[in-house]
Structures are given as C-alpha cells and as structure tokens.
C-alpha cells in the first residue's frame, strides 16, 4: 500500500472513497461540514435519520453523493468531543481499513484532521500511529499456503493534512513505513517453521542484508569460533542439536567514525524443546518463536537502514537450537563463560540467558554507548505482565527511562521491574559462581539479575518480550513484530530524526 500526503480540500478530491469523521450527537467538524455543504446536506440528512450514532469506529458507507467527485463517502464515528486515546484511535483506523479492504476501490482519501488524539500532536504523533496501523494491517503470511490470499484492490491511501502540518505528516509516514517494513521482516522470520529457520538460515539472511547495503558489515561466528572465544555457556546450549550455533554480527556505520555505537543483542533460539529439561508437548510448536528477540533486532536494523539514521549500530544475534540428545547439556553441568564466571546449569530450559550472557561479554569490544538485549526469556513475564507490555530492567536509570519513553511514544509499551540485590542471592550455587535459575519466585527478575552480572562494563537494559512477541492460538496466531516500534523510536530519538 502506498501512503501519500496532500493538502487539499476534502470536498474537492476525486477518489474511490473519501473518509470523514462524524462525532456523537450528530456533531460535524470542519471537514464534515465542508463535505456536507458540498453535497447539499446529504451528511446531515443521514445523521438526522439516526443511521450513525457517531461512536468511535462505527462506519456508514454512502454512495454517489451529489456535488462530490468522490464515488463513495465513508463516515466514521469519532465519539464525543474529547480526544481519543491511542487504543481507540488505532481501533478507529483499523475499522476504516477493514471497510476499505472490502471495497473494490483502488484508492482512498482519509480526511481525519478533525480528530484529536490524547498526548499526540496533531500532525506527527497522530499520523505516525495511523500510518503504522494501516501498514501493519496489510501483513499476510501465506508463504506455505497452496491457496494465496486474494490481491487487494486498495493500492493507495492519501492522507489530507493542513498546509502547516504537511511536512510533519510526511515525516510521520516515512518513519511509519520504515517501522512497518521492520515489523513485517520480524514477523516473517518468527512465523517461519523451525525446519527452515535455523541458525545457519538466519546467518544467510544477515549476509543477504549485508550484500544489499554497502554501509553494513556482516560477520558470522561458527561453533568453532564460539568455542575458541571461551563462550562455554553459549556453546552448551547448541551442543545437543544437529544445527550448529551461530553468533551473527551486523555492524552499521551511519554516524561518525568516532561515535560509540549502540548495541542490540537478540536471543535467537530457533527452536526450544527445553533440552533434557523437556517442555510439555502441548503448544511446543510455538517454541519456534523463541528467536523473536533476534528477529526484532533484525527488523529494527531494517528500519534503521531504510531511514539511513546517522548513528552507529551493532546487532548481535545469539542463535542456537535447544534439543535433547546424547550430546546435550545435562542438568548439573557446569560451564565457564567468556567472562570467566562459572555457571551451574540447573535447568536446560533456562537456555536463553546462557547464549545471552556470553554475547553480552562479547559486546564489550565495541565500547558501546548502551547495550539493549531483547529476549523471549521467561514465562514468568507473561504471568506478571500478560501480553500488553514488555518487561524492562537495567543498570542505568537514564537508559531505562529513555526506553520507557520510547515505548509510550511508539505505543509499544514496556514496564520496569526491579533488580534489587536481594534477588541476586537466589542465584547462589554451592558448586559454581551461580546457577542459571533462581527458584520459583520472581523468575523474570532473577533472569535479569543473571544477565546483569555480565553487563557491568556499560549501560545496559534487558527487555523480556515473552508475552509480546507473538499471539498464541486462534486465527490471529503469529508473530507481532514487537518491540520493533519501541526500539526504532529509541534510535530515532538518539539520532534526532
């Protein structure tokens, strides 16, 4: 779908479908009044009959109104006079998109300037959410279906903006388009079956991306290099699988050579059986999504590349497959990490932190401004926060605050959890420097505490996306593309874009 921005009068546009808002109690804003006047009171007449109550997201399609060049006019309810929240705004836009998809029109014009959104400016903030909602709603994953989705008639959507705000709306569309590209790439990787999407496949994806972008350097560390670097924890996770582990390094130089990079670290467990600590069979198919941390880093990089942000960014994807076999890691094994610290592996299903801890140590060599790791790390995070918000922890209040703010602005929220010293005690082991689990209490926090022991050399934050990375079961099952909006917003803010 192509999104364009224009500054013209709604009543004069020629289009298959013109979309205008109508408030409750037959309230017409400036746009609706102008269209009503041009159509000789057709809008008012419909409202007087009570055909549309004007509640947020309600729609009514009108055909061939006199005095207009638009073939159809779609009225959408905008509610009472107060501003809509982010959720209501997104639902309204999705409602409009749903109607437009069912029509045979190749284009549509949205004249929604009269709708206010809480805590969003009238141009960039409001239209960024609108554009992301439209573009993300276009996503279809039918690669393995013998019968593909029908091509959609709607090819172009024009957003009408006032002249003063047109440039900001265009900037919003540009950013939203890049984020949507990144989210779609993330969702594609997450939705792929694990027999195809394994560590070596992700390495090939990285190489292909490097070939397509001159400013991107790609290095793939194989299992021998991982072992030679002393990454005993990382190596242990993949040793039970026929698919060897890979540490994928993508280095984007968009800033000055002297600028310290931001580092994103993604957990890339392409399939997680739990290893010897085997997971229950029910729902195990969804463990292909255990690489969504790495996928979201990939997607964020895609957005950064599209926008050519003036920053330096290093992406580290810690990829392995966690399988049981005669050569797999056992509960009770002790491994030495790249940092020199030893870990007693009490549960092989707590494997994500093992690939991440060595990767966090590896990140030190880049002398980063900040390091953010993203992982579908703990089921405990789903229990604590559900699927609406990602868990967030860190060792630097400014960094955590910047990420929380980015989440609010991108409508991709996170919630901070503590890393108090008392939780560290739960990781004590009688045989090694630490165990890889901290008991049944505060599982998300103790996982963060574990990682914090390997991130003392820099400002660091950890995002647990176990509840937000994919939707379980039902017709909407699949990867969500989160937290690409949050991460991209954070980098946009750092770049001043």
From Swiss-Prot:
One GO location term (cellular component): cytoplasm
InterPro entries in UniProt: Leucine_aapep/pepB (IPR011356), Macro_dom-like (IPR043472), Peptidase_M17_C (IPR000819), Peptidase_M17_leu_NH2_pept (IPR023042), Peptidase_M17_N (IPR008283)
Cofactor: Mn(2+)
Active site residues according to the UniProt entry: 279, 353
Cofactor-binding details, from the entry: Binds 2 manganese ions per subunit.
Record-linked Pfam families: Peptidase_M17, Peptidase_M17_N
E.C. no: 3.4.11.1, 3.4.11.10
Keyword check for Acetylation: no
A single GO molecular function term of this UniProt record: manganese ion binding
Positions with a binding annotation for Mn(2+) 1: 272, 349, 351
Keywords per UniProt: Aminopeptidase, Cytoplasm, Hydrolase, Manganese, Metal-binding, Protease
Compartments reported by the entry: Cytoplasm
Family: Belongs to the peptidase M17 family.
HAMAP family assigned to the protein according to its UniProt record, in alphabetical order: Cytosol_peptidase_M17 (MF_00181)
UniProt name for this protein: Probable cytosol aminopeptidase
